[in-house]
């Protein structure tokens, strides 16, 4: 991803719950309010949710944190029985069509789904927010700060579609990818 887009991704799209590990999770629980879907992106965030008996509908992990291997405790802790397991390749700094397809399939599934990303899941929150039903919640970690809680609304989806297009325009095979992604985002 080009450096010019990085500041756009640093903008908070939700509410930051500060704290380390389970402290951040404990503070956000009161604001979950029965979401349509609960989606967790990131190993440490997911670990602390599961450790607090908060079970996401979808979790997206890559066995890494801050671009380094996650601890064995975190890796093991995100492998929760009862989840269908899907593995997808997604290189760092991009959003692949395969990742989008897997997230889309998980959102319409009636099963809990663990998406294991070989590569990097850092950008997975963006398509998750765009494809999730309204009133869903997407949680992702802000390293050394806490957990971001994003409630999915029409206005947020509209705002993020422009950013999403800018990211995809910088990738190879952009025309076909943009066409397929827009189709998915519109429910086809």
Swiss-Prot record:
Record has Cytoplasm as a keyword: no
Signal peptide per UniProt: none
Pathway in which the depicted protein is active: Cofactor biosynthesis; coenzyme A biosynthesis
Listed GO biological process terms: coenzyme A biosynthetic process
Intrachain S-S bonds: none
GO MF: GTP binding; kinase activity
Coiled-coil residue windows: none
Catalytic activity: 3'-dephospho-CoA + GTP = GDP + CoA + H(+)
Keyword terms: Coenzyme A biosynthesis, GTP-binding, Kinase, Nucleotide-binding, Transferase
Annotated Pfam families: DUF359
EC numbers: 2.7.1.237
Binding sites annotated in the UniProt record for GTP: 43-44, 62, 121, 144
Organism domain of life: Archaea
HAMAP family, per database record: Dephospho_CoA_kinase_GTP_dep
PANTHER family: GTP-DEPENDENT DEPHOSPHO-COA KINASE, UPF0218 PROTEIN TK1697
Function: Catalyzes the GTP-dependent phosphorylation of the 3'-hydroxyl group of dephosphocoenzyme A to form coenzyme A (CoA).
Family the UniProt entry places it in: Belongs to the GTP-dependent DPCK family.
Protein name from the UniProt record: GTP-dependent dephospho-CoA kinase
């Amino acid at each position: 991803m080009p450096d010019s887009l990085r500041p756009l991704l640093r903008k908070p799209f939700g509410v930051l719950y500060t704290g380390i590990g389970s402290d951040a999770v404990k503070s956000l629980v009161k604001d979950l309010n029965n979401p349509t879907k609960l989606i967790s992106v990131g190993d440490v965030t997911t670990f602390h949710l599961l450790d607090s008996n908060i079970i996401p509908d979808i979790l997206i992990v890559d066995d890494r944190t801050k671009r380094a291997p996650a601890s064995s405790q975190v890796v093991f802790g995100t492998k929760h029985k009862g989840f269908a397991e899907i593995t997808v390749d997604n290189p760092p700094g991009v959003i692949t069509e395969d990742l989008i397809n897997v997230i889309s399939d998980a959102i319409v599934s009636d099963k809990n789904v663990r998406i294991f990303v070989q590569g990097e899941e850092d950008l997975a929150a963006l398509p998750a927010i765009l494809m999730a039903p309204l009133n869903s919640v997407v949680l992702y970690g802000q390293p050394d700060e806490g957990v971001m809680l994003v409630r999915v609304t029409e206005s947020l989806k509209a705002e993020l579609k422009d950013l999403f297009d800018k990211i995809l325009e910088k990738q190879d095979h952009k025309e076909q990818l943009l066409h397929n992604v827009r189709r998915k985002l519109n429910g086809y």
